[in-house]
């Protein structure tokens, strides 16, 4: 009893000391500020943080720093909003065999695997993420534990289980099938009542149009956005017809481009200003970097992906990816790189607002390194302007989730979600692979 009381007192003192440190104002001084709005960076910036929020922004010599503030030098650094990853799967850690994973580890999702994924994301500079497919109970619990400060991780916007025509055998906990429009509405209502932040729709080309429409209409009635797969042409056609808010991926086929009717339908949708932007999360890094990965599999040995992962799971993952170039999951990937580039360009031309997302957690895509690689691929393999790329990982995701009042840019009054990295990320975007400073809600984690 005495030992338990002692541990309780130590825990209480630890929490108290953290609160005391966080109670002091913080000043980030000297860095080059990229605020998320797309304007010219602010040199010699000063950012004042009080508690969880940003209270003032200025430059060295133009504003007074409170005498009791903790001063953190950001000289020589790029300072920018905490990154968003708009497509993660915290229930996955990069193992190559889904069937084995789904049979072996569900009992450890909520207690070990999802918290480890969340911590890895945060250490990579990801302070907000959309978790698009995981068991409902664990999704809510892990999100809420992060929000309460019990475990480290990004602010999570969770979908819980996929909504689809029929779950694959053994995946019923995180894939919910629907039978008819009434059942579709009931499933969405169940998710909404449980507290999800977003609805994930997949394989909608295998559902009736009434079912697809019921999912979207019910979700919107609960003020929840709907994201949907865009792997196959009919998924896009039905999603557009039903009013889906955001599409994921650019397709799994080797077709060289989108069919003409889909390009026209996308352009017609983006022209409807009253509906707001049509968002798209292409998740293309894995296609464009696959050849590099096979030539240099040493990158799979980065210990960052082992953070908080139990040793037996680390060993299992390593065993599953030991022959990286032989995984059936990726054999057609080299043939998709050209179509990915074409479709990305067509989406740009059609006026969609694209978001940074990675599908992290799928085979060989680790939460610790997927996000910066996606930004790097946009800039260095697709020629996207670095500032636009950064906005796709900061400002626009917050707009899509309708939380831009509090997130997405470094602005007075917003939550202090801030990262910093040595060097000029507008010239060398890959510097983001080594984030030096991570602040989330005013608390420094790195």
Roles of regions detected by a PLM:
Residues 6-17:
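Bacterial N-terminal signal peptides
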Residues 21-23:
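Boundary at the C-terminal end of the N-terminal hydrophobic targeting segment
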Residues 77-145, 169, 210, 231-249:
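Metal-associated gating/positioning segment near the N- to mid-region
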Residues 90-109, 165-181, 251-257, 326-332:
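Acidic/histidine-rich helix-loop elements
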Residues 114-137, 154-161, 194-204, 225, ...:
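Divalent metal-dependent hydrolysis catalytic cores, especially in the metallo-beta-lactamase
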Residues 201-336, 362, 382-383, 401, ...:
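Active-site core of metal-dependent hydrolases
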Residues 221, 324-329, 337-424:
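His/Asp/Glu-enriched, well-ordered alpha-helical/loop segment
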């Amino acid at each position: 009893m005495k030992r338990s009381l002692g541990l309780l007192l130590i825990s209480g003192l630890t929490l108290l000391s953290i609160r005391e440190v966080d109670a002091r104002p913080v000043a980030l001084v000297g860095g080059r500020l990229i605020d998320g709005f797309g304007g010219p960076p602010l040199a010699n910036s000063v950012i004042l943080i009080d508690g969880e929020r940003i209270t003032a922004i200025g430059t060295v010599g133009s504003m007074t720093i409170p005498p009791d503030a903790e001063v953190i030098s950001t000289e020589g650094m790029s300072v920018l909003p905490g990154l968003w990853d708009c497509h993660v799967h915290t229930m996955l850690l990069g193992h190559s065999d889904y069937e084995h994973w789904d049979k072996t580890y569900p009992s450890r999702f909520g207690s070990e695997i999802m918290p480890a994924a969340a911590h890895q994301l945060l250490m990579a500079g990801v302070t907000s993420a959309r978790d698009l497919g995981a068991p409902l109970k664990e999704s809510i619990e892990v999100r809420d534990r992060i929000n309460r400060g019990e475990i480290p991780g990004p602010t999570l916007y969770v979908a819980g289980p996929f909504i689809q025509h029929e779950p694959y055998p053994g995946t019923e906990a995180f894939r919910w099938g629907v039978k008819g429009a009434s059942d579709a509405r009931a499933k969405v209502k169940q998710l909404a009542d449980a507290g999800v932040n977003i609805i994930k729709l997949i394989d909608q080309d295998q559902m009736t149009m009434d079912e697809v429409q019921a999912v979207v209409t019910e979700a919107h009635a609960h003020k929840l956005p709907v994201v949907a797969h865009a792997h196959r042409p009919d998924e896009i056609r039905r999603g557009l017809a039903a009013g889906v808010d955001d599409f994921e991926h650019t397709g799994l086929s080797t077709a060289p481009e989108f069919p003409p009717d889909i390009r026209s339908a996308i352009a017609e949708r983006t022209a409807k200003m009253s509906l707001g932007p049509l968002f798209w999360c292409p998740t293309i890094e894995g296609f464009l970097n696959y050849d590099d990965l096979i030539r240099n599999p040493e990158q799979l040995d980065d210990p960052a992906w082992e953070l908080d992962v139990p040793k037996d799971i680390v060993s299992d993952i390593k065993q599953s990816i030991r022959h990286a170039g032989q995984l059936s999951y990726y054999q057609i990937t080299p043939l998709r790189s050209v179509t990915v580039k074409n479709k990305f360009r067509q989406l740009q031309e059609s006026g969609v607002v694209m978001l940074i997302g990675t599908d992290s957690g799928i085979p060989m895509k680790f939460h610790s390194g997927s996000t910066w690689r996606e930004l790097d691929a946009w800039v260095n393999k697709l020629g996207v302007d670095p500032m636009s790329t950064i906005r796709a990982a900061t400002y626009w995701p917050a707009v899509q989730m309708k939380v831009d009042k509090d997130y997405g840019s470094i602005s007075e009054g917003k939550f202090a979600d801030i990262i910093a990295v040595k060097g000029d990320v507008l010239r060398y975007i890959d510097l983001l692979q080594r984030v030096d400073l991570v602040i989330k809600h005013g608390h420094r984690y790195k």
